[in-house]
């Protein structure tokens, strides 16, 4: 119903949540946006790119979830923009309007090594196995969204798997089975609580550059705060 630069007012005909992702359709192009305010039947959305060409009456599709990122093998060795578009797979020097790419390669195979076994009791963020991503051991964890305790029914044998292949089957307290792959989604604005202790950085990372080490020292592992 209104367009001011990257801020668009949308008339909605259903439930809409704060920070929900939506797509504004402009011909064959879909522009990603985020709900920043809800006021009755109107939602104010902020578009992540140019709104040139968007007109009153364009259809808007709400996705029912917040801005999410995919977590899995390939994440640590890729370059992304702020929407987790893989820059290495995008064509040209500049990003095309409405162009989005898959953040992780679903066809690449990774050498999976199990660390859990059948019968283990696990909770969210417990390790099920790992893959080598470069020189780093990339831990494959119980999905962060899982609540309570689960029993490991089976874990895939060591070998090569794609990120969407099932590497473990977990059983909850109701006896329901859940297939777990090497990838999971998580909303970027929600803190991950799947940890017992959060260590604080305590050691200075010596860069050898005096102006950094003296005036702007950096802790190994980031700020941690």
Language-model features and meaning:
Residues 21, 44, 59, 77-78, ...:
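Structural motif
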Residues 36-42, 73-84, 135-159, 177-196:
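Short, compositionally biased
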């Amino acid at each position: 119903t209104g367009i001011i630069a990257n801020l668009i007012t949308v008339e909605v005909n259903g439930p809409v949540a704060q920070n929900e992702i939506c797509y504004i359709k402009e011909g064959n192009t879909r522009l990603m946006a985020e709900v920043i305010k809800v006021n009755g039947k109107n939602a104010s959305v902020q578009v992540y790119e140019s709104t040139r060409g968007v007109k009153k009456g364009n259809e808007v599709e709400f996705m029912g979830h917040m801005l999410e990122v995919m977590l899995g093998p390939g994440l640590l060795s890729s370059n992304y923009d702020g929407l987790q578009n893989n820059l290495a797979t995008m064509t040209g020097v500049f990003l095309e309007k409405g162009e989005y790419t898959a953040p992780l390669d679903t066809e690449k195979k990774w050498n999976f090594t199990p660390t859990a076994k059948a019968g283990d009791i696990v909770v969210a963020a417990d390790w099920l196995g790992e893959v080598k991503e470069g020189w780093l051991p990339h831990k494959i964890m119980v999905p962060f969204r899982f609540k309570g305790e689960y029993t490991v029914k089976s874990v895939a044998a060591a070998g090569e798997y794609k990120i969407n292949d099932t590497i473990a089957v977990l059983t909850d307290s109701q006896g329901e089975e859940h297939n777990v792959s090497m990838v999971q989604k998580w909303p970027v604005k929600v803190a991950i609580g799947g940890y017992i202790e959060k260590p604080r950085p305590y050691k200075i990372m010596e860069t050898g550059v005096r102006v950094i080490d003296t005036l702007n020292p950096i802790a190994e592992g980031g700020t941690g705060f």
